[in-house]
């Protein structure tokens, strides 16, 4: 299970690195679901669940200040938990969409607190005319500021298992009643 968790984290990191290879659409749920199926040994189910999640995330692109949920982690974890439990596509949706929303928060935290030092160092390199340094900061900042965060969350989420993820959802999505306040 640890090896599968690590591989799923790497799949999520590959999907998040899509712009490294141009706009390859690696991050789309159809591709992520298929790769998750490869890791878990059930490619047909991975493709089916990826297609289901593709319908849910269709049109999930940033427009203006609107940031869509982080569909890579939602697809990988939703597909992985559905394949390992033998549940239906509705499970992939009910796990994938909340996970995608939560991971978006973690991704934004990485962009606010981890990425800026790399950007400032890149500015220093640019002022010196060191383009290799700028490129290096670009890759390192993207890796540590976003990519690694998503990979670790996916790997730890899968390794912790469904009950731990469900407990987290219950903790976050249970709000007190107005009568309790």
For the regions a protein language model found, what residue spans apply to each?
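Hydrophobic transmembrane alpha-helices
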Residues: 1-73
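Short helix-perturbing small/polar motifs within transmembrane alpha-helices
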Residues: 7-8, 12, 16, 61, ...
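Alpha-helical membrane segments and immediately flanking helix-loop junctions
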Residues: 10, 49-56, 63-77, 81, ...
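Membrane-water interface at transmembrane helix exits
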Residues: 15, 19, 41, 53, ...
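Helix-loop-helix junctions within the multi-pass membrane cores of secondary transporters/permeases
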Residues: 94-172
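Single conserved hydrophobic/aromatic residue that forms the stacking wall/gate
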Residues: 173-181
């Amino acid at each position: 299970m640890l090896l599968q968790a690590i591989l799923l984290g790497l799949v999520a990191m590959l999907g998040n690195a899509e712009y490294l290879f141009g706009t390859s659409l690696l991050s789309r749920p159809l591709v992520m679901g298929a790769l998750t199926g490869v890791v878990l040994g059930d490619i047909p189910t991975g493709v089916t669940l990826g297609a289901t999640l593709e319908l849910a995330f269709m049109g999930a692109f940033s427009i203006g200040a609107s940031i869509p949920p982080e569909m890579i982690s939602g697809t990988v974890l939703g597909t992985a938990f559905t394949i390992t439990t033998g549940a239906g596509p509705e499970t992939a949706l009910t796990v994938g969409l909340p996970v995608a929303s939560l991971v978006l928060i973690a991704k934004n935290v990485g962009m606010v607190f981890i990425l800026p030092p790399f950007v400032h160092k890149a500015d220093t390199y640019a002022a010196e005319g060191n383009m290799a340094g700028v490129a290096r900061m670009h890759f390192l900042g993207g890796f540590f500021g976003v990519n690694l965060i998503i990979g670790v969350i996916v790997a730890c989420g899968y390794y912790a298992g469904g009950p731990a993820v469900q407990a987290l959802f219950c903790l976050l999505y249970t709000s007190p009643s107005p009568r309790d306040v």
